[in-house]
Amino acid sequence: MENGVLLQGFHWYIKPEEKLWKKLKENVDEYKQLGFSALWLPPAYKGVGGKNDNGYGVYDLYDLGEFNQKGSIETKYGTKVDYLACIQAFQKAGIDVYGDIVLNHKMGADGTEIVNAKEVNRQNTNEIISGDEQIKVYTLFTFPGRNKKYSDFIWHWYHFDGIDYDEKTHRNTIFHF
C-alpha cells in the first residue's frame, strides 16, 4: 500500500471500564471499511498505576494483563488474552498493528538500594554540582507477582544511569550514578 492510513486506537483519558482491547476488536470491520490500513496501540504492559495507568508509567514489560501486580490483574485496557485477540482480529482483517512501548524509564520499584551518586544541574545534566553522596533509590525491580515467568531478570541501580529522587533525604533532584 503506497499511502496507508494509521488509526491511533487510544487517547489519554480512556477509562479502564471501557475495555479498549475488546472495544477495538468489536469495531475492526468498521475501521477496515473506513480505509484504515494500520492501528497504533498504547503500551500493553503493566504500569505503576495498575489498571489506572496508561502504560507510560512503565513497571513490568512482561505483564500484559496477566499477573496480580500494582493492585490489578488487568491493565487499563484489558487482559493479555483480550490484547492478543484484538491484534489477531486486526491482522486477519489485513490491518497492520503497531504497539507503543517505552524502554527508557521505569517506575514503581519493588524495593530500594543504597548507592553512590552525584547531583547534576537540572538545566545541564552534564554539569555535576555535588561530590559523591550515598542516596537511597527505588531501583530494585523483582516483579514478585509474576514470579519470574517469562524472565527472571532483576533490575538494580546499575541498570540505570540516574534517578530523580532520594528516599533518604526526600529530595527531588537529578542524580547520576
Residue ranges and their predicted role:
Residues 1-26, 34-37, 43-177:
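Substrate-binding/active-site clefts of carbohydrate-active enzymes
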